[in-house]
Amino acid sequence: MHSSRRDAFHPVNGQPLASLSMTPKGFTVTTAPWYDDAREAASKRPVAERPTTYETGQRIAQFIAGPWLHAEHVEAVVSTGVQGVVFHGTGLGHLPIDDPQNDAPENALLWRILTRCVNRELPVVIVNQCIHGPVDMNVYSKGRKQQAMGLLGHGVSSTPEAMTAKLHWVLSQNINVKEALSSNLCGEHRETLRE
């Protein structure tokens, strides 16, 4: 991934969807067989002039985990009535929620606000800041603590943008968020993504 090179559009955690061949007479697009199969298996829907499967009033907040992530910021945004929160976790999907040496009280405050969010049934989803690899909350105790808190995202290997769009769609359909986020709706959770 690069901001200005021609290979800036390599797929993340996946294989190319298609290849493009250009000649002086024009170009041809050859889609990958697995993508053709996925397109055939996808549900058909009519083309519309405005969104029909997304509730346009849904609001999803996003935060990036790091030393600047503070509970009062999360609380202020959550108080505006968002329908979901996506956190870009570090490494395997961790958030700064522990204070083992009693020198990071802001982490304990973040843990409290996240617990309140989950208790209010506000979906809190962890995605990965890393370009490659899944969120794996089973490796370290912090990840297991996050799962026990009710934070979602274990096993997610899609990009933050794809997961945010998926959360928006799931909330718009009024279906079970936890089940839908762990399911494969359109190829975002293919096993090959976890390599």
Specify the residue positions occupied by each region the protein language model found:
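Accessory alpha-helical/coil subdomains and C-terminal extensions
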Residues: 1-97, 188-195
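C-terminal non-catalytic interaction/assembly regions of soluble proteins
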Residues: 76, 89-195
